[in-house]
Amino acid sequence: MGKQLRQMKIKEILHNHDVGNQNDLIRLLDKAGIEVAQATLSRDCTELGIIRSRTHQGFRLVLPEDSPGQIIRGLVGMEVQSISSNETAIVIKTLPGRAHGVASFLDQLKDIAILGTIAGDDTVLVIPLSIKDIASIIHDIQSNLSQT
């Protein structure tokens, strides 16, 4: 099966099922007759902007169009514990295991002032294009993660 058809099926599954993680998604794809490797599914999820967010029912894989952007911002924002910086970079502390989702969300914003992000388990390192823009980038990050 081609990439486009596989990604369409992924979207369909996420719209019709509460999927908690990529392993659950692999099982549902397998039931639909689609075999996919974990690495391929991970790339598909990144390309589709899928994030794993906490809901009242536990964790769930969420497509960006599943909810208005403000809800996704709020979900990702709830995972951020602090934002700090020094003279060269920005560090975002998250709940354990949530840094990748926050970094993915920031990458999806395609902010030209952000050169890139690196995620660990509970820490995101944000590298600015210019150190002169650090205060502005922090403000933009806080605005984009706002729940209001």
Curated annotation (Swiss-Prot):
GO terms for biological process: L-arginine biosynthetic process; protein complex oligomerization; regulation of arginine biosynthetic process. GO terms for molecular function: arginine binding; DNA binding; DNA-binding transcription factor activity. It is found in: Cytoplasm. Its main location: cytoplasm. It holds the Pfam family Arg_repressor_C. Pathway: Amino-acid biosynthesis; L-arginine biosynthesis [regulation]. InterPro entries: Arg_repress, Arg_repress_C, Arg_repress_C_sf, Arg_repress_DNA-bd, WH-like_DNA-bd_sf, WH_DNA-bd_sf. The keyword Cell inner membrane does not apply. Belongs to the ArgR family. Regulates arginine biosynthesis genes. This is Arginine repressor. It comes from Prosthecochloris aestuarii (strain DSM 271 / SK 413). The gene is argR.
